[in-house]
């Protein structure tokens, strides 16, 4: 659903300013919503704020290996480095 072209234009592109950005299903939906979703969202918020304050960015290094499965769209291997800008 997160890559449904009828819901998200350019679904494979990260566009955080989308009007419907919060309509993703990353943490499930309804009674199947992940119990740790709010904690994960808070942790990501703090991480991004701290990286912004320290003027840091994440750089992808090397080849990206994706996990292909019915219920998971993630990464098997994703090498990164942190740098300042």
What are these regions (language model features)?
Residues 39-67:
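Cytochrome P450 heme-binding "Cys pocket" and the immediately downstream C-terminal segment
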Residues 26:
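Divalent-cation-assisted or electrostatically stabilized phosphate/pyrophosphate-binding catalytic cores
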Residues 34, 38:
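Catalytic-pocket segment enriched in acidic/His residues
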Residues 69-72:
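Short Gly/Pro-enriched turn/cap motifs at secondary-structure boundaries
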Residues 14, 44, 80:
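A residue-level signal for conserved active-site and pocket-lining positions in enzyme catalytic cores
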Residues 1-21:
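Conserved cytochrome P450 K-helix/beta-meander segment immediately N-terminal to the heme-binding cysteine loop
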Residues 76-85:
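C-terminal domain-closing interface element
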